[in-house]
Amino acid sequence: MKKQNPKKVLQKVLIMMLSALAISCQDTSLDETETNSVAKEQQNLTKKSSLSATSDLARRWAPIHYKDVDATGTYAEGGKSDYLTAINYDNDWNGENNWNNLPAFANSLAAHCYYSIVESKTHWYITYAFFSPRDWTDNPLLYSLDQHENDLEGVLMIIEKDGSNYGSLKGAVTVSHSDFFSYVPTGSSFVNGLESIDGTLQMRDYNGELHPVTAQDSKGHSLKAWPQHDIDGDGIIYYPSATGTAQIPSDNYDNYVEYKLVDIFESGGLWDQRFNTELFSSPAGGFKGNDFKTGGANAPWAWNDGNDAIVQTGEFATDPAKLADNYFDGVGNLSRTYINNKYNNGAGGIVTLYQNCNYTGYAIALPVGNYTLAQLKSYGIANDDLSSVRLESGYKITMYQNDNFGGESVTITGNNGCLGSFNDKASSVKISAL
């Protein structure tokens, strides 16, 4: 047997050791890459959207919109009173001349839709609002009762973040005068909550993407999911423009008119105009108007359903996660913590308290703090009426049997779908970081 050179043996051993080390490092690097990839994906779900991404998101879920038109009646202006247009269609932000300026601008009613996006850790909430200069009737007996200057109705699209660029549409709530109507697309996990679902949100292909379909009736312009309203005879079908084009209908039967999406928060836009005393009666969002009735229309931050109790005036736009969490059950791990809310950066909370087990019943979000029974009641929480809790990571809630933090207590550090022996026992709570 040939005797091996000790130096060559040592070299071979060193080469083998270095090769093994390189493979080990490579495996570790791959593990770290996979871990970082997962972490980045989770961060992307909670990362604040850029301005360009926001406008793309608004375009992605903007509705195909049916607008019924009535050309008859003293105040119809040949159907133009039902056209969509800009609030400042007459080149000013004066709310008290929109009714009377309509005849002079009747052939230049370029289609606009106002939108705003409020973003939470888990969802985007997109409000779309459609304006007409007149809310009118053809019944002379109702001229002074029903008609008013300016009309703005809209819809809220609830988009769940799922790691994709535009998320997944889960539900919608529309504004029909002083009532809200809720809808879900086929396949949504959303089910009846405090409010019953009013129908299916139809989807239709447009430029290779499915868009929701909404509709308004003529005269009063109530907005619902199509076909609960539909075109009856003459009417216009509006589509969201991908290029910022605001088209003018060719006639009352035009079935393809592009509307321009306008950010409510743009500089000098509708939100900035809330202090304009020629447009609004106050920053709270009630439009001025002096034809037939004083006012009558509202901006999104003043929209209200007259009988839904838990959701307060304006929260449709300013605290949409609250609306979604209360109107629907089956919402999954819906966060009530906002990362972009220009309407109200103090809205939402760290902890959401639910009336019933399995995150059902009314849902009230609270920020960090200590809450006596009186304070809980001010948020709409009744005594001895809580049964499940959602918590943002890194926080805890201590629930007390008695008011002023007395009696038996329980501390919760994560989501709890049913409080068991502490169901319907809380009279005060403390919320803090871990």
Regions found by a protein language model. Name each.
Residues 2-14:
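Bacterial N-terminal signal peptides that target proteins for export
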Residues 13-22:
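Bacterial N-terminal signal peptides
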Residues 22-48:
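Bacterial Sec-dependent N-terminal signal peptides
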Residues 38-118:
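Solvent-exposed N-terminal domain segments of exported/luminal and surface proteins
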Residues 86-169:
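Short N-terminal edge-element motif at the start of the domain
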Residues 120-122, 144-154, 162-347:
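Domain-length functional cores that host ligand/cofactor binding and catalytic or interaction surfaces
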Residues 132-135, 179-180, 358-359, 404-405:
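Solvent-exposed loop/turn segments at secondary-structure junctions
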Residues 347-434:
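Compact beta-sheet-dominated domain cores in extracellular/mature segments
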